[in-house]
């Protein structure tokens, strides 16, 4: 079994990169990090540990970035600073200035794990992992918005095109402003290779058309739950096709996934995901899916 490679959003999760919230978030300034009033460092750490237990119970091996009080509170959201391919890791470039040091944490960890670095997105280019969606193993969609720009998308394309991978950029709306980040993955969560949970009013129209043309079935997330959660109701992590982990408290969206054939596990995440604007997908960087 290969030790790395993840060009699918929903194939069985075998190996994943995470970072504990125990120290990273302990002294976080809620205002500086744009966290909501429900943020509580100790409770967030406990909820993160509960997520890690679910991930491990699925059979995935968790690789941990060193947990220390380095002031990088958002570094628990490991999905964003890197992207994994069958040829190695892409080290990305963050659109949020407070997160600028995080890609180096990923590069150091991959080096320790013996995973090759395929390339890097360099400033002024910006791409965050939350804007990257594998439509299939040869097609990568990237949302162009406040966190990922055309320069960064072009750099990713330059790195992946020689591998036979097509990269497409899709414009995202501003939605609630620059600080309240809207990633492409804020409006789509693949549940299987041919099934995705979406909030279609915010989907880029050409991306929606691409999904439909490729026969991907779309499950609509509940609009009220999407609004009340600032999109976190839609952020679900597939541990294998049709088996997902979601934030508790959104029964209509959970029922929609179950009606489409999914098994849904939930965890309490009010102090972590809701308060800090990042769900179970954001808290994990798949290293190996197969």
Where would I find each of the regions flagged by the language model?
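The feature marks the mature, well-folded catalytic cores of soluble enzymes
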Residues: 1-290
């Amino acid at each position: 079994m290969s030790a790395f490679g993840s060009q699918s959003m929903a194939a069985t999760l075998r190996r994943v990169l995470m970072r504990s919230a125990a120290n990273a978030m302990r002294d976080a300034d809620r205002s500086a990090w744009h966290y909501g009033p429900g943020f509580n460092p100790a409770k967030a750490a406990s909820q993160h540990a509960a997520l890690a237990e679910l991930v491990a119970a699925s059979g995935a091996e968790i690789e941990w970035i060193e947990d220390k009080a380095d002031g990088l509170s958002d570094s628990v959201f490991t999905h964003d600073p890197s992207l994994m391919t069958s040829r190695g890791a892409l080290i990305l470039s963050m659109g949020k200035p407070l997160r600028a040091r995080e890609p180096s944490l990923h590069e150091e960890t991959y080096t320790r794990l013996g995973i090759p670095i395929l390339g890097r997105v360099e400033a002024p280019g910006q791409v965050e992992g939350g804007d990257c969606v594998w439509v299939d193993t040869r097609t990568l969609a990237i949302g162009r918005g406040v966190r990922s720009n055309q320069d960064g998308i072009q750099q990713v394309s330059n790195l992946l095109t020689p591998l036979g991978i097509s990269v497409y950029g899709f414009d995202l709306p501003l939605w609630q402003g620059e600080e309240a980040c809207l990633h492409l993955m804020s409006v789509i969560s693949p549940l299987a290779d041919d099934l995705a949970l979406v909030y279609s009013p915010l989907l880029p129209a050409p991306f929606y058309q691409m999904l439909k043309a490729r026969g991907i079935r779309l499950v609509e997330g509940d609009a009220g739950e999407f609004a009340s959660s600032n999109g976190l109701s839609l952020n679900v992590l597939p541990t294998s096709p049709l088996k997902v982990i979601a934030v508790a408290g959104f029964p209509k969206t959970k029922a929609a996934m179950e009606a489409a054939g999914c098994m849904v596990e939930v965890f309490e995440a009010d102090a972590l995901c809701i308060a800090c604007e990042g769900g179970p997908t954001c808290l994990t960087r798949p290293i190996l899916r197969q």
